[in-house]
Amino acid sequence: MAGMLKIDGIERTVPAAETIKRVATTAESLGVTRLADITGLDRIGIPVYSSVVPKSGDSLSVYNGKGARPVDAQAGALMEAIERQTALKARPPHIEASFSELSKSANALDPKSINQKLSDDYSDDRTYSWIEGTDLVTGELWWIPAKLAGYLWHDVPHPSCFEINDTNGLASGNCRQEAICHALCELAERDTWTFAELGAHHLPRQRRSLVYGHRAKDGPDDLDMFPCVDVGPNQLLDKFHAVDLFPVIRDLTSELQVPTIFASVADEHITNFPMAHSGMGAHPDVNVALRRALSELAQSRCVDIQGVREDILPPNASPEFFSLHTRRISAVDRSSWYLGRSENTRRLEDIPSHKFDSLESDIDFLVTRFRACGLDRIIVVDLTPDETMYSVVRVIVPGIELWATDHGRLGPRALAFWKKHA
């Protein structure tokens, strides 16, 4: 279909240099004081940049970007800072009502349809704040719990329906379609990651517990459930190989059928350095998913070496359940699906892939795949300030699985998967 055409190779509607030019003044007004090149902290050479917001109201003050070129990494770092700071400061009009009351007269999103842990004191009859969102498919208006759609809105009246406030589905772009596409890809990645973690790690433990009881934690993951990928010639992968690093690359693509690539590497050459890192990418085009996974893998190493990002935890930390994925790994376990290699392999070109010319076509594909899995409601909350040359949205999909990032709550699809394979 016709629409917002993409620039080949970066999946954006304008060149990265133009993005930087558009948002430079906004970034400064939102508190960005520095854009730092941290590529040289590591030996790989894939560009990674950090944008710094010293007086951030966020839990983070350093944001990161990566890419095949320095200009792409610069744009990514600025846009991540703008995305989070815009979401922090946005205050769309809200109403105050209970779910029971509001759902009688309007489309109100049931908090229980979201696969996150509800607050201990949640009640359908308790008053909460709500803001408007739009169903991406039907165009209908929906009322969404404000603190689900927003980010760290502590001053908005009434408590949150949920235990935590995350950034899943929060995305920015040069235009609304670009932001929505980024958000949908992120949600597809989170969903797919959940099924991979359950299938390759937790199900083998469950099976062993039937035989060995309390010793269920001992033993390998299922390394063959998700095949390793034979990538073939690839410039980003060559940068790893040139410094004696050989990433494990897996195809995690699930029932969503959105190509999802996971890349990890263990570095045992440097002492006193966190040994294992990973990256992931999901996109209709498997080559874009691979590029995102490899560049994120490089970024995770640089950010770890930089040592200033507040959400990176030491290996011996006892994190909250929602921050387990940010804890460093201090030992290489080749029996884990994250780092172990599989005898089950497939070629990159054999993974079903969908390369479209427009963002609208990407979005149509993603929406079709979500709906094929019973994820029929896709709601967009626009957090974009007036008269800006960028867009920030929160996309909310009831039923999407987020457990891999927060270990909060398994939804019906994940539970059905567990029962089928246990």
Q: Where in this protein do the model-derived segments appear?
A:
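Helix-biased "structured C-terminal domain" signature
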Residues: 1-422
